Each structure stands twice: as C-alpha cells, then as structure tokens.
Amino acid sequence: MKVSDRRKFEKANFDEFESALNNKNDLVHCPSITLFESIPTEVRSFYEDEKSGLIKVVKFRTGAMDRKRSFEKVVISVMVGKNVKKFLTFVEDEPDFQGGPIPSKYLIPKKINLMVYTLFQVHTLKFNRKDYDTLSLFYLNRGYYNELSFRVLERCHEIASARPNDSSTMRTFTDFVSGAPIVRSLQKSTIRKYGYNLAPYMFLLLHVDELSIFSAYQASLPGEKKVDTERLKRDLCPRKPIEIKYFSQICNDMMNKKDRLGDILHIILRACALNFGAGPRGGAGDEEDRSITNEEPIIPSVDEHGLKVCKLRSPNTPRRLRKTLDAVKALLVSSCACTARDLDIFDDNNGVAMWKWIKILYHEVAQETTLKDSYRITLVPSSDGISLLAFAGPQRNVYVDDTTRRIQLYTDYNKNGSSEPRLKTLDGLTSDYVFYFVTVLRQMQICALGNSYDAFNHDPWMDVVGFEDPNQVTNRDISRIVLYSYMFLNTAKGCLVEYATFRQYMRELPKNAPQKLNFREMRQGLIALGRHCVGSRFETDLYESATSELMANHSVQTGRNIYGVDSFSLTSVSGTTATLLQERASERWIQWLGLESDYHCSFSSTRNAEDVVAGEAASSNHHQKISRVTRKRPREPKSTNDILVAGQKLFGSSFEFRDLHQLRLCYEIYMADTPSVAVQAPPGYGKTELFHLPLIALASKGDVEYVSFLFVPYTVLLANCMIRLGRRGCLNVAPVRNFIEEGYDGVTDLYVGIYDDLASTNFTDRIAAWENIVECTFRTNNVKLGYLIVDEFHNFETEVYRQSQFGGITNLDFDAFEKAIFLSGTAPEAVADAALQRIGLTGLAKKSMDINELKRSEDLSRGLSSYPTRMFNLIKEKSEVPLGHVHKIRKKVESQPEEALKLLLALFESEPESKAIVVASTTNEVEELACSWRKYFRVVWIHGKLGAAEKVSRTKEFVTDGSMQVLIGTKLVTEGIDIKQLMMVIMLDNRLNIIELIQGVGRLRDGGLCYLLSRKNSWAARNRKGELPPIKEGCITEQVREFYGLESKKGKKGQHVGCCGSRTDLSADTVELIERMDRLAEKQATASMSIVALPSSFQESNSSDRYRKYCSSDEDSNTCIHGSANASTNASTNAITTASTNVRTNATTNASTNATTNASTNASTNATTNASTNATTNSSTNATTTASTNVRTSATTTASINVRTSATTTESTNSSTNATTTESTNSSTNATTTESTNSNTSATTTASINVRTSATTTESTNSSTSATTTASINVRTSATTTKSINSSTNATTTESTNSNTNATTTESTNSSTNATTTESTNSSTNATTTESTNSNTSAATTESTNSNTSATTTESTNASAKEDANKDGNAEDNRFHPVTDINKESYKRKGSQMVLLERKKLKAQFPNTSENMNVLQFLGFRSDEIKHLFLYGIDIYFCPEGVFTQYGLCKGCQKMFELCVCWAGQKVSYRRIAWEALAVERMLRNDEEYKEYLEDIEPYHGDPVGYLKYFSVKRREIYSQIQRNYAWYLAITRRRETISVLDSTRGKQGSQVFRMSGRQIKELYFKVWSNLRESKTEVLQYFLNWDEKKCQEEWEAKDDTVVVEALEKGGVFQRLRSMTSAGLQGPQYVKLQFSRHHRQLRSRYELSLGMHLRDQIALGVTPSKVPHWTAFLSMLIGLFYNKTFRQKLEYLLEQISEVWLLPHWLDLANVEVLAADDTRVPLYMLMVAVHKELDSDDVPDGRFDILLCRDSSREVGE
C-alpha cells in the first residue's frame, strides 16, 4: 500500500481493521464507504472452499471446478504479512434479522440467474431485476447467513429437545407408529450442516416481503414497508376476527429479540399467506374482501404425498392462534432437523420440503376453520367436559358408586388430546347436591316446561337413539331427550350451558376472595396442592401420585420430566385397577381438604392396619419431610444351607463350589443386606451360578413368591440364557416381553430380556405399579420383586452407539427390587463406575463399609438408587491373569477367510465333534463367509440386521443341535454364550479392542484355540469418540494385565500365559490339540510347496480389498481347481524341465510332479499316480537325487543318469508298468536297468506322467492331451499324445533314437532335456533302450507300456477327467486335499461365484419364460384353472407396509446390488413373484390367521428371495389346500355347476330374497341404485356399513381418477382400512382397484350394459339406469369388506364359501344364479338384495328377522 493510500486509509477511521484482517477468509468485509472512495480498487475473483467454507481468492493453482464456481468482487488489496494478502470488499453495517445486507454499487452481477436456480431451487417462481439484486445479497454474505441459520436451528433444536413432550411439539412431529416423539439427538456438527443447507431458504423467509411476488400484501400507506396485516389476517381466517397483537407478537420476549425465533416465525406466516394467495390482485391498495363463496382459490386442495401432518387447533381465538404459532415453531425444527431421516432435506423437484409442510399445515388449519363441525381428534372435547355432563343416555358420564354412595364423574377431557376417561369421585356433600338436582329439581323443571317444549334442535354432538329415522326426529323429541339426559341446560336459548358461563362464575366467586382464579389456574393450583400437601405416605403409594397427575389432565411424561413424578400409565393396568387407583386418589384428596374425615373408598378395605397407622403418623406432621417407609411383608429366614440345597438340585448330589471366592459371593448375594452388588470375574468363571443358585433358593420359599429379572445385552443370548436357567425345572423362566405385554402371570420366577426391554417405558410403568397390580390381581402382598440382574453391564459405557437407547433406564424405580446385581467379565472399576452412573445409580462405593454401619446409614433409607454399589473384583483378588487356559495366536495373513478355512478344516479333521465361532467385522462379511463355507461345514450365521425372533432361533439351534459346527457372526456372538463343545474361536477384525478380545476368548470355557487373524499391510481404523482403542502389537497377556490393573511381568518369568508360543499353563487336551493341528499344518505345507512357485498372475491380485466373495458351489470350485491344474502343473513341468532336467525331473517326479499331480488331480488320477509312484518311489528318488546329481547329470546321462533313473524307475516305472505289463516285462525291465533302460523307463515315466497329468486336467484328455496343456507342454507332449500314444511310443523305439538320446544328453543336460521334452520325449526315451532291452522293453512298450499308456489315457484318465469335470463333484474328492483347493480359489469383486450359482438355481426354479409368469404356474395349476384363480392387481401395494418394500436395494430381489441374483432379460422379478406368493397365502387364511402369518414371516419382510425359498418348501401342501378349498369356486366360475337359491335350505327359511323371482330381484336392484343416484350417496361407504353420506363428485365424474380423489377426500379409504381387514394389505391396494387391474371384468360388464339396454328397448319399456363401471366396482368392494353382510350371505347361500382376495370376489359376483322361478340373474344382484334386506323393510312381504335359526356348524354374522 502506498504512503498516500495509507494516509487516506487512516483518515477513513477504520477502527476494526486489525480484527478484520485476522479473519481467515481472503475476502474481508469493510463497511467504510470513505475507504473505497479514496483508495483505488480492483476486480478479483473469489470462490468458496467446500471443505472449510472460507472465501478464497482465485490463484494460478486454483482448480477448474473452483474457477467455475468463482464470483467477482470490487476489492482493495492489503498486504498483512510476508506474501500474505487480504482483500477488502464494501459491505454496509452488519445486517440484522429484519433488514439484512444492502446491495452496493461495487457489486458486479455475474450469473445471478444461474445462482438463483441452483442455490435457492425456486425456479418455479418469477423474479425481476430488483429481485435478483435482493437475492444476490445472500451470495455476497453467505457466510453470515450460514451462521445465522445455524444459530436459529440450534436454538430450535434446544427448545424441542428440552420440551419433547410439549403439546405443540407433540402435535407437529410425532412418530405415528409408536406415538413417541422423534426429536433426535443431533451433534453440533450435524446441526451446522443442516443449518447451512437451510440458509438460502432462511434468507428467502427473511426477505420475502422485499420481492415483487409479495407486493400484493404490502401496506398501502406511503413509506410503510411492513405487511398489510389486516388484509393478511382476513386471508388467513376469513370467518373469525382475531386480535392483531397476537398475530404480530407471538411472545413479548420474542419480539424484543430475547428469542429471535419470533422474527423468523413472523416471516414464515407471511410466506404462508403468499403461498395461499391467488397472486397479485389490483396492486397494493386493493382492499377487496373475499366472501365465503370465494374461498376455494384461496385454500387449494393439497395432495399430501404421504406426508403425515397432525391437525391443529383452529386459530379463531388469540389463545389458539398462539398455540398454532407454537406448532409452527416446532414445525421449523421438525422439517429442517429432527425428522430429516436422510441427508436430503430439500426436495429438488418440488422446492423446499419445509414449504410443503407449511402449506399442508395451514391448509389443515384453514380447513378446520371452514368446516368446524368436522370431527377433529385434537378438538374433541374442546372444554373440560363440564358442559357435557349427562346422567342418562348414550353419552352418560355421571354415575353412583354402589359402595360409598358417592357421585362419580367419567370425564374424557385431556390436555394431550387423548379421549381416555378419567374417574373423579365427589365428596358426600357435593354428591348430595347433585343427586338432589337430578332427582328433584330436574323433574320440577320438566313439569314446568311441559310436553310442548321444543327449544332444542338436533346438533351433531347429540347421539340420538331409539328412532328408526333420525332425520324425522322433531325438536320436541330432541328437547325431551336432552331434559332427561344432560345436567346443565339453558332452557331459554335451547342449548347447553356454555363454557363461558361457568368461566364467568369463576370470575365472580368466591366473592370474599381478593383474587379470582380461572379454570386453568384453579386446576394448576389443585394439582400443586396435591403434589406438595397430599403427598405419598408410603413407598407403595407412588403410583397414586402418578394417578393424580393423570386425573389433573397432565400426561405421564409431563408429570415425570417437569414435576418429578414417577412414571406411570393407566393403560398399563386393567380396567378395575385403574378405577381403584383413581378412587384412592380422590379419597386422599377429600380427606386432606377435610370434606369427609371418615370417607373411605371401596378399595381402602383391603389395606392393612399397619398401613393405616403409618399413614396417620405421617399425616400428623405435614410440614416435615416425608420419609419413605417400606411396607412390611412376610419374610422367611435364610440360611447357608439354602444355597447348598439349590446347588444339589441343579448339579446333583456331588455339587461343590469352584473355590472359596464363588462360595463367598453366593452367600453375599443371598444373605447380605447390600442393596446393590457389582461383580467382575473372568469369563468362564461361573458368574451365572452366582445368581442362579440364590434364585433357586428364593424360589423354594413357600410363603413369599419372588419375581426376578435378568437382562442381557443382545438378543442372541436370550435362548442360551433361558436354556441354562431353566434346566432341571428348578426355575420357571419366561421372556420379559410376556411381562410387558400381559403382566405377571403368577407362576414365573425369572423373566429374561435384553437391554432394550429394560429401557422401555412399558417396563418402567409395570414396575412402578407392581404393588398395586399384585394386590388387585392376586389379593395378596406376598409376591415380591426379587433380584434385578444385569449381565455384561460394561456395555452401558462401552457401547457408544447404543447409549441413546439406554436413556430410559434412568426412569426405572430400582428401589422396588430387593437387590440389584451387575455382572461382567470386563468391567474394571473405572468402567463399572461410569456404567452405573450412566443408568442413574450413584456408582461404586469409594470405600468399604461395615454392614452394621450400613444399616445405620441414612443412605439406606433412601433406597437402592441412592446407595453406592459394592464392587467384588475377583480378578484382582486372585491376582491371576484371565484366559491363561486358552492358546492365543495372533497371525498376519494374506487372506483372513482362507486362513480361517484352513484352521477350521484342520480342527474338524482332528476333532469332528467340536464347534467353532468365527467373529467377522461386518454383516456383509458374515453372509459371504456363510455362503462360501456351507459346502464344508454345517454353518449358522447371525448379525444385527436379523429380527429378534430369528436371532433367538438360530442361537438356540447352534447351542442345542450337535450337528452344527460353525457359528459366524459379528461381535454380538462373543458375549455370554456358553457352549461345551466349543474348541476354537477365530476373530477376523482389525479394530478389535481389548474387551471384545477378552469376551471372545472367554467363550472357550475348558480350553481351546483362539486365532486373531489380520491382513498383512493393513492398518487399524481410527476409533470413534468414546470407543476403546484397538489392541496393540505385542504380547496379548500384557495388554490383558494392563486392562485389569494387574502387575506387569514384562521381561520377567511368567510373562506369557497361553500366548507367544507358551504352553505351560495349557491343559493336556489343549496341548494335544495344538500338536495335531501343527502336524496337519506341516502336511498342508508340504502338499502346497508347488504353489509357492506359481506365477504371480495366479495369486490374488488384490489382497487388501475389504470385501471378498468366495466360490460357493462345487462347479465353481472345480473350475478354479482345473484352471489351476492346467496353469500350475504345466508351468511347473516347464520350470522343472528347463534348468536341470535330471535333478528336476526326478525331484519333480518326487516332490513336485507327484505332489502337484496328487494335489491338483482328483481321486482317479491320484490312484493312477499313486499306482505308478509309490511312497517308496519318492524316497528312492530323493535318495538318488543328491547334491552330486547335478554334476552327474550335467556331465552326461550315460551311467549316472541310468543309475539315478533306474533308482527312480525300479519302483515307479515298474509299479506303473507293472500295472499294465506282465511278469516277464517287469523282470526284463528290472534286469535291463542299464544305460538305456533307465532312459526308456524315465521316458515312460515322463510320457505317462505327462499323459496322466494332462489327462487329469480337462475333459478331452483322451483324444488330445496336448489340447489341455500349456504352450511348452503342448510342444513336447503333442508328439507323444497324438491320435495314438501307443503308435508314437512304438514308433520311437528305433536304433537311431539311441544316438539321438546320447547326443542330446552329452553336451548339455538342460538343453538335452529341453530338446527331449519338446520334440520327442517319448520317442527319445523309448528309443534309448538297448537292443536286448528293446526286444524286451519294446515288447513291453508295444504290449505292456502301450497298454499301460492307453489304459491310463483311456480308462484311468477318462475316469479322472470325468470325475474332475463333473459339475456336481464329489464332496469327499473335494475335501481330499483341501489346501490346494483353497489357495487356488478364484476371487471376483462383483458377481461372485456364489451369486452366479444362486442366480442359476433361482433361474432354473423360476424360469419366467413369459411376461405372464404367475406363481400359480409354479405351484402346478393348469391354464384353465389359472384363468379363474389369476391374481389380478397384485403388486407392491398389496403388501403391508415394510414387507418387500425396502428402498436403496435392487428392485427385483431386494438385495444389495453386489449380491443381486436377478438375471439379464428377466421379465418378472422375484419380488413380483413373492407378492403373488403372499397373495396365495392370503387365499387360504382368514383375517386373524393371515395377521399371524405376517408376524411369522417377519424375518423375510426384507428378503423376497428367501421368502420364495420358504414358500417353495410348502409347494405341494399349498397346491393341495387350494385345490381343496377352492374346488367349489372353480366349479362355479368355470360354469360346471350352477347356483340355485332353492338348493339353499337356510336361505329359503331365513330370507325373503331367496323366495323372490328373478324379475323382483332385478327391480329391487334397480330401485337401490335409483335411490343412491337421487341422493348422491357414496356407493362404497353405503355398501360397506349402510352409511348414507353424500358425495356428488363420485356421480358426476366419468374418470376413475376423479372418483378416487373424491373418495380419498372424504376419507373413505382411510375408514375402510381402519374398520376392516383391508388394513392387512397395503394402504393403496384398495384405491388402485379402480385402475386397469380388472379391465377384463370391466369390458364384460360394459358389454352386459349394452345388452341390457338393447333388451329393454326391445321389450318396449323404459330402460332402467344401471350404474357405470366405477360405481359398480365401488359396490362390489364395499360388499367384500362388509363383514356382517359376508357372514350373512355365506350362511344363506350354501353353495359358496369364503374367498379372501378381492379379484376372486369380483369374478364370483358376475356368475349367474337361478332365482326361485328358475330365471337367471347375476349373483351381484342377489347380493344387493340381501344387503338391502339387512338394512330396510323394502322387501316384498315385509321385513324378515335377522336372528335366524343357527346351524350347528356355522353361525350367523353379527
């Protein structure tokens, strides 16, 4: 900067220059206009860094993408350091929420249009140039608005999280499935990300009044920038005036900027008005009022598209408007942060999701204002219910208690919007007044008014009964009903006493009070008195406090979280119990007020005298602190002998404790008064017996019944725990879910559940109400809560990702239990203390306390939760490092799965009856290993994505089924499972921490092997916040000592215990198992030596890939084996025969060829090879191929080669030749082991080995072995394996071959060998025999050797080739040499061999040869049967929610795309077939059975392919059931049988319709439709339940879509699903029946309409108007779901039975039946006649009696 510029800069008085330059952005905002007018400026480009969010200047090295996103600014450059430059840009004073930044003349617009479209996503709106200038402010100040949006969103989230159960919050975002709030706990970084995404839309909301599209609502006064609130007010609520102060000032503190949300909400409301407006109309001064008739364009119809928005209170009063605005505040949080299940908060297609929410929300609000008579759950009842008190009639809520003779009121008003009734008992004086008013004063009032009184009209709130036609009821009738029903009437106006009248009395009375209270303040004051004065006097009376909260119209959550009242719910107890609770609460209140000192409700007689005395003593001193006194119960004495007897019951008469520590702990738990105990013992120590024996001892007590609870961390442990704890019948064990759903059953001693059950609200409520429930249900107080046992409680602290799920445990009343026991094998003091505090307990005791001192301690009186937990650390007491009995090996391998498979194969070869556990790191790896290893073992796999029932079932199967060998799972299988046969644990996880290691190794109770396998060149991933770090390199035992706080022995004697090769502490069985495994490993290493020499191309190309897939079929495995044999064997032969032939040929015949041949060939080839090269051959060959062999061989192959080869061929060749030659040949060959015999024999060996080796590689070995070998072997073997090996071998036994062989073996053995192996190995070898040998050996060559070679080529090679090429393979063959198979297994990243095989199997099972593939074809039905049973309209909407409807997966099979089993060209997906299979199951089940079936197949809800396999197992059974159940249906629909009404005896006796003629039935049918047409009645609703509601759009529409929209608008489909079994299908299934599903029926029906019209005209009568297709379809759908009608029709018409699918019902309805006069009418006409008969008396000859005579086998419907 120049000196002159610096002076000008100083004059600018830029005080904040230093702080501004410290900003990390290259672009710094400067508000000084003087600076920019004084100092020269320049234009530079800037961009926003995506990672840091900072504004950076574009430089030479800036990337292309950043340059593309850059923008230009007018700036002043300032050097702030060495080579550090900042740029100042002009921006006026920092914008606030009201105004925002102001554009300056230094702004250079660039790509503003593109910016608006891409950034704001409001391309559907039109902007002018001024709007673009306004919108560009955000681009210039994006960082500011990002931070602004983040602060607002953070504030919203804090409010919603602090008050998740507030009424406004609950209404706006609530999980509509579970009813619980779904405000999620978000990290600050997540909220910041959401805030940045929300920033553009926050900017729009703040500046929406500055845009041209908002000009319609600008104020008319000059200079006024605010909104015309009066006009906006009228647009929002055109019928009800509201006070403007509540509109503009939501809360005073908000508008005073104490809470800036007020400004945001104000703008949101303006945006809502903008959305509903019809556009700019007449400029800013247009004051035209909108009438009621013009409301449709103001509030357009909104299609929710699946968005669930709870209806709000109508904002027609200031208070309700404020509530509505509070809901909008919650809506802002809901739409922007809390309900954002995915990262995509905004909808790219339809703009901002928040705008849609607001639009739908205010549409509901405005619609409620217009239609105030419509039923709204949030508005019923709208007052405290005092106006609607009735002493008679259907709405009666005033009763008299039989015992106390007191008036009781059942009111259903509740603040949280529910209609659950509340029982309130009045005192005696008030009851007398009410009784006198009803019995005396009301009768006098009726007499005074007289019989002509008719002031009351029929209002919707009245439930008029006793009249056949409610529309014909007169006002006199209504008035008489009201006088004899309701208490508070305004007879002058003809209405109930308004709520305002009662409120007015509250303002006037009591007259002597200086300050009056309204109803709300009175109610709050009463409940405050109830909390602080009418307090609980007993420990067991805490539920009464909760009952008082409920009776005061507070939710349970409000009472617990805000007022500190215990959790409770009246819905968790029976109806009688709820009544007694509320009676007792009223009694306590009346007694405290002194209204009746001697009043006792009927329940109080069950109290004990001791309780009354204690209560009187407590009530005498209200001002003192109320201490909790434990109610006395019978208690039997305990002794140490109880534990011994329990042990003998469980383990037999020879029972003994493991050690004194176990004995002492059992006595401590059973005998001591310590309320809370924590135990840390090593895995496998027997922690279960520490509480199992005391539980058995408690169960043996006769007078007192103890009910205890055990909780484990994972579902997979439930089955194992229930089996162990329920053995020998010592305890009655049941799941906790039974207790939560049904309560205590009276027989269970121990309930077992998981942590989620412990944290559930229902369990907390059950425990809180335990005392009262037991006393009310069993009429005794001798049932007591025993032990609360939590196993592996360290998970409360270490399971970081589950800690949010444990929050509900803090609400549990621990004091209700006699003792709490916490067990773990990996919970040192620090972990245990933190885990206990996390669930609401005090933590561990800091120092030991004597039991006598404990009894005197004041803490004991406060209960278990306030007393510290005593810790028993058996690991420190014994000073022994755990898990020393297990041999722990840590290995780094290339492939973890392959190494694990080797270990498992070796284990089961050594110990066939053993079991093993494999712990994988991911769920995908679990499934892949299970699929890959199924051909080797009986596998069970488990991971967290399975359902709870499936986890329990699989765990139980592995524990109980001895044939199951391997359990594969994630780390959830490492805790708590006890399996005696377990001998090996393998962990495949690079992120294994010390706790997971100890828990996994601890599964080996009696010793065994534990392998920790990790990949080479791998690194451990960074652990998440709060998680334990992974285990380190080095000694495992030392890390275990460090974790438990034991003394380190690093570098000392005894450091290694069961690790690092130490075996001193292992059992003899474990050592023996290790030795056997080592021997097997040596054999495998010897057999796999040739694999080391494999080219790198045949090794795994990418061993560091995280996800691997393995071959799972014999076909794929054989392919890999054969390919490896081709490549590796031939390559090894080439390598063997190039460098040093003699040594390598013999050595390879011994070590390489034999081993390779043995390893790579199957049984038949091995047999051939073994026949030719015995074990002695190898030894003899090895003996002869010493170090001097090379010298010998390189020199010449005359004497030494002969000797060496003779040694090789005396056993090998003779054995191989002996297999095919005679005795003379053997003797001659043995005798002729001279210079030439050996070469001959070695050549024979070479030829035969080549033939054998090549013959065992492929299928076409016989004809041409060279075709299957590699290049080098093809060259040398092709000469000997042409058309006839015999001829080539005979042809090569000439004299010239000897010289050739001698020539090739003199100069260079290597070249000679290469020459002999390329041109004529067999010929040169066979020709090397001498004259005498030739005569003998050539004969042997022609007769025996040829036959040997031929036999090997034809028989043995064929057999081996056939066996090897067999696709199915042989399990024993494959497992004969498993090591080589594993090492040669191919690997593919996508489309693994397992997937390919699975795809092939499914394709064969479901060929899908045509587009009309149907599951009925799969079941075996014929085409004519399928025609009538065809499943029309079965698609995704038929399935219930969550069944085969997962997103983000393959649409055809619902699997991950890497595991997709769909095949190219597939016309019908597996998911489609699964839908139809589900429909077939629906055909065979009624509503209840089908509902149970859906629950049974819950594990398959996300796996249609697995469901098809499950379905195909029952294929024949299902086919038989359909044939049996639908035989009548096929006979009728195929016109083989005709229905005649006269054949139905019950129909003729019980219905007039069955005695009508066909003409009468048709006339009745047309009359019904004529009445429906005239009244414009909803057809579907009428035939569903005879409800005559009007729907004019349905009759005027000619399009199916319009009809569906009309029915949907009226809520018909919603009522249909809630009232009938339609809810068992998808929510859109019934709606889609109006589409093209039934086009064949539609064409048939429309054809019948034409024929009907033609017949009517031909007869000369006026044609009757018949319904069009849509109305006709609505009729049949309504009849199908009308349960009463269906039962009635099936009872009367004996020829038909039940059908459960709508298409079958439609097809059945169109068959013709014979009426009483033998004329044919469609069955649907008969249906309509029966339907009409059930509802009216328009049937000829009068109305029939519905209560017909009942058949013994079938009952009439209700």
Curated annotation (Swiss-Prot):
InterPro entries, sorted: DEAD/DEAH_box_helicase_dom, Helicase_ATP-bd, Helicase_C-like, P-loop_NTPase, Sir1_ORC-binding, Y'_ATP-dependent_helicase
Disulphide bridges, residue numbers: none
Chain intervals with Low complexity compositional bias: 1142-1360
Annotated ranges, domain Helicase C-terminal: 900-1051
One of the GO biological process terms: telomere maintenance via recombination
PROSITE patterns (UniProt xref): HELICASE_ATP_BIND_1, HELICASE_CTER
EC number from the UniProt entry: 5.6.2.-
A GO molecular-function descriptor: nucleic acid binding
Induction: Induced in absence of telomerase TLC1.
Region described as Disordered: 1142-1384
Alphabetically ordered keywords of this record: ATP-binding, Helicase, Hydrolase, Isomerase, Nucleotide-binding, Repeat
GO CC aspect terms: cytoplasm
Ranges where the Helicase ATP-binding domain occurs: 668-845
The keyword Cell inner membrane is assigned to this record: no
Source domain of life: Eukaryota
Binding annotation for ATP: 681-688
Record's keyword annotation contains Kinase: no
Matches recorded under PANTHER family: PTHR31583, PTHR31583:SF2
Biological role: Catalyzes DNA unwinding and is involved in telomerase-independent telomere maintenance.
Family: Belongs to the helicase family. Yeast subtelomeric Y' repeat subfamily.
Name listed for the protein in its UniProt record: Y' element ATP-dependent helicase YJL225C
Source organism: Saccharomyces cerevisiae (strain ATCC 204508 / S288c) (Baker's yeast)
